[in-house]
């Protein structure tokens, strides 16, 4: 089957909204919305392998640290795992006083009862009700008319009131989503929401949340903005309602739709870090927040250590962040083009502390989000007749990880500037060997002994220190590297680890690469090569540790 010559025979354009006096095009966003993360619910349910409780708790703590104040934690009636996770958050005191847990439920009494039970003992909570309202869902999925769909929402809303009254110690906030709102007739969406509002009887002091999802993107962002503005104008008790957005990215315009929706009068935005979620993902809260930041607006979220946040998200979701993802990708602050490099260099030369940021090609100062300037101006691979990475792979079988390519290119650039000549593959390898493989000071690995028992590792290393001293470090952990890290006298964090074989057969060696952060400093890479993969990984860690300490010493001097 091929694409149709006349797609109008199969697809139709979404109708425009009759709103000739729309005001949102002349509006600007002047403050951050209320943020709600759906990573642990919408994001988690879309993963090939959903997070276990340990990963979910790690993710929760990261969201709290970033500053998200409303977090949709689970679908507690869907599984015992989700129910138990909510109980863990409440019973073990993981919910700060300024943070509200949110949970989702369908419109059935047994599921609603189970959901409220999961929240017993919570100081405050948002309970989120939804049912689909669009024509296709009414006709194809549920075989219900408009009245039937409305009755489902109203009856469930009454059950919310009933079960909340049984737990008066909790400060309840009710949220309703007419799922598939953006594909629903506006008058009907308003009718259903008005009926739910009538049951819940909100006040300006105790508001309800109406969440208006673009469950599937069906039109351009301006149409979604028209829908939001029309809804904000016409919904009853607007002063007692928080209008929330929940955009997906099926057409690639989730960010734009959310921003225009905020201009149209919405108060709140739901999404996921780096855009995880069903199909093409939920709107990316990080991009939304940093878009505000680069317009001079405090986003009320802290991404000062964006690489640390990314590390948690990648490990919990088991999905990589694209190298060209806005703000956080490995390549977004990197210029390969000579003209781009020249403009950036001139921008840095003129940029003064305290002045408005005006460096060409860089919409944000990388330092604001914990990035260094070293990756910004980078050697163009084509100028090296194949590039640094290509030469190392082809001539020596060494495949540098992406972020290490960026770091090492700066080392090569410094050498080419010093020599004023093009470097050969042998010269590049010699520089790699000197910079990484010979990084043996102040600590040189002499030997190590590793013991494995019941899935745990215990390691003892002999280290040659400064002044011909001999040191012995011991540590335990879930693996060899974790055990070694536990035995170090310095606090370090492994940000990334990669390994591969060099060659094949009995003469093969192992190459290991570690990205290490020492005492909260800037991440630094290390390399280890050995016949034994464990030894190679230990050498890589010592390489990174020594390089970091040497750089810190040089900076202090």
From Swiss-Prot:
* Domain (Pyruvate carboxyltransferase): residue spans on this chain: 33-307
The gene is leuA
For region Regulatory domain, the annotated ranges are 439-557
Enzyme kind, highest EC tier: transferase
Tell me where on the tree of life, at the top rank, the source sits.
Bacteria
Instruction: Describe its assembly.
Output: Homodimer.
**UniProt key word Membrane:** no
Write the protein's name: 2-isopropylmalate synthase
> Which NCBIfam families does this UniProt record tie to the protein?
leuA_yeast, PRK03739.1
Q: What is its EC number?
A: 2.3.3.13
Output the GO biological process annotations, alphabetical, semicolon-separated.
L-leucine biosynthetic process
Question: Where is it located?
Answer: Cytoplasm
* Provenance organism: Pseudomonas putida (strain W619)
